Structures are given as C-alpha cells and as structure tokens.
Amino acid sequence: MPNFFKSFFSGKSETPESEKQKNDQKNFEIFKYDGLRAQRMGRPDYAVKCFTEALAIQEEFETMGYLSQLYIQMGETAKARELLEKMAAMEPHLTSTFLTLANVCFIQEDYQAMEEAANKAIAIEEGNAVAHYLLGKARKGQNDDLMTIAHLTKAITLKDDFIEARLLRAETLLNLKQYKEMMEDIDAVLAQNPEEETAMLLRGKVKESNGQGEEAEEDYKLVTEINPFNEQAYLYLGQLYINQKKLTEAIGLFDEAI
C-alpha cells in the first residue's frame, strides 16, 4: 500500500511494458485503418501491406478477415486459406468462417477439405442451406452424384428459392438422365428468373436428349441473344449443328463466336 501512495503522489510515469503496449495498440490501429482506407481507394496491394503489419503486432480476428477477403479477390487462395484456418481455430463457433473456407477449397479443387469445412458449418448450424449446398458441391467434385443430389435436396428443402442449388441438382440429374425430375428444378428456376441462362441451356440439353433438336436450338440461340458472351451456349449450339450434320452452320457459328 505505501508503494502505491508513493507512486501516486510522486507522479511516476507508466512502466516501460505498459507504454509499449499502448504504442503497439496505437500502431496496430493505424495500420488497420490505413488498410481499410487503401481498400476503399482501390489499392489492394497497399491494403495487404497495412493489414500484414497490423497482424504482426496483434493477431486480431477482424483484421484477419479483411486480409483473407483481399487474398481471395487477388486470387491468392493459399494465403487466404491459411488465414481462414487460423480464424476457424480462434473462433470455432462461427459458421461464416467455415463457409468461406469451403469456398476457397472449392477454388483450389480440394474437395475433401471443402467437404470437411462444410460439415463443420453444418455441425454449428444444421439449418444453414448454404452449408448443405457447399457440401453438395464438394460431393459433386468427388463424382458422387447420388450424395450430391441428397445434400442439394436438403439445401432446397431449407430454402425453396435457392437457384444455385436447383441448377446444380438439375445438372447432376442430367448426368443421370432423370429428365422429369430435372425439369422440375429448371421450371422452378425459370419461374423466378425467366432469363436464367444456365437453366435455359439445361432445358435445351433435355430437349436435345429427347430428340427435339429444333426446340433445343431455340433455347441455345435465345441464350446467345440474351448474352452474346456466353461461350457455353455457342458450344452447345455448335455441337448440335455437328450432330445434325450442319457443318457449314457450325463453322459459321464458331467463327462468329471467335
């Protein structure tokens, strides 16, 4: 107690350790907010430097999130994944971290790791439709069509208007030649968005498989009119012409696309 009063009345300065902590915190905040400003100004390289300097002082979860998103935008998925794995260890109860990690693993085509991340998200939040969708994508990447459909069906049950899940399920059903079930998904998607290009292309593939070449051609052409840069539409249409022995039309189409 006497030591306390002595230091209080004598006006002694803070200990070197306490002063260092204050300086470190100040420098951390400067680097962090400089990084955010750089990000807003469209200078990702400088933002990365600032966030990296900030994290060298303090491994703060929020700043790690900012940096991981930057790495994803810049295509540096290995660095993003390393950060996200650290974040998942720091805050293992956050679904969003595992969802982002699953998406990064998908970009890297590491489907087993993607499946693990999606399963961890589901363990935290069973009713998360996106997590079940990502699990379906992971099984699709491992060529497991039946489990892909099962997980996508769960996602759609949780979120009936989940366009991406319906499109992926339709694509998988096409592989299995289950056209009736596939068209239920296509019709549901087109009811929400009549100009959904992937849905129209898949509908064209069903018509083509059923021997309705002219109707398939209409769908493929419609997509090229909506979006002249949709390469898949030109490929499907060109392949249809080749199958119909319309080689002149196919060559002309591919020349136009190029």
Regions found by a protein language model. Give the residues of each.
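TPR-adjacent "capping" and linker segments in tetratricopeptide-repeat scaffold/adaptor proteins
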Residues: 8-30, 53-56
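Helix-start (N-cap) detector for alpha-helical repeat units in TPR-like alpha-solenoids
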Residues: 28, 61-63, 95-96, 129-130, ...
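Short coil turns that delineate tetratricopeptide repeat
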Residues: 25, 58-59, 92, 126, ...
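Register position in tetratricopeptide repeats
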Residues: 40-41, 73-74, 107, 141-142, ...
